[in-house]
Amino acid sequence: SGADTTFLTK
């Protein structure tokens, strides 16, 4: 999901 990727790239 896009939400998962948001925190992974942080």
Swiss-Prot record:
Induction of expression: By elevated hydrostatic pressure.
Organism ancestry: Bacteria, Bacillati, Bacillota, Bacilli, Lactobacillales
Further facts: On the 2D-gel the determined MW of this unknown protein is: 65 kDa.
Name of the protein: Unknown protein 10 from 2D-PAGE
